[in-house]
């Protein structure tokens, strides 16, 4: 069964440049996304409980977005952090795109909610 793309949006109170650092650097991602994060030659090594997963940076634009692809995933699947601004409130919005089996989207969304709460705590939100 193929996975489906789903999108989550979170309003955040910080500048896009600060948020981008937390989404695109080993030091920033290590604060909230994984226990340990290293990067070599555009490959990120994410560690949880002693095991590591590798993801390549597929595409990125400074202060706008970064897209990763797990090396074990099909080429068309990715996860992405995008930074946008609300036209009405001018508030920064974090948009997360990811793939999951249809039956797992709710659980995966809850996991992202938990991780983003940790990110917001680190950002002082």
Question: Residue ranges of each PLM-predicted region?
Answer:
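Short, intrinsically disordered, mixed-charge
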Residues: 21-31, 63, 114-121, 125
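Hydrophobic ligand-binding cavity/cleft-lining segments
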Residues: 1-37
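Short, charged low-complexity linear motifs
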Residues: 5-6, 17-18, 91-100, 124
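Compositionally biased, intrinsically disordered low-complexity regions enriched in proline and serine
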Residues: 7, 21, 79-80, 115
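A conserved amphipathic terminal alpha-helix motif
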Residues: 97-125
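Hydrophobic pocket/interface hotspot
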Residues: 19-20, 29, 57, 68, ...
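Hydrophobic-ligand binding "helix-grip"
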Residues: 35-39, 44-102
């Amino acid at each position: 069964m193929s996975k489906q793309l789903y999108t989550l949006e979170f309003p955040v109170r910080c500048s896009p440049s600060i948020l981008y650092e937390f989404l695109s650097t080993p030091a920033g991602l290590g604060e909230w996304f994984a226990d340990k994060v290293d990067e070599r030659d555009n490959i990120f090594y994410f560690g949880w409980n002693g095991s590591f997963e590798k993801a390549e940076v597929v595409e990125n634009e400074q202060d706008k977005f970064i897209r990763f692809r797990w090396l074990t995933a099909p080429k068309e699947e990715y996860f992405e952090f995008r930074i946008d601004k609300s036209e009405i409130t001018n508030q920064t919005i974090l948009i997360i795109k990811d793939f999951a089996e249809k039956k797992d989207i709710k659980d995966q969304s809850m996991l992202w909610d938990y991780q983003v709460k940790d990110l917001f705590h680190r950002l002082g939100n």
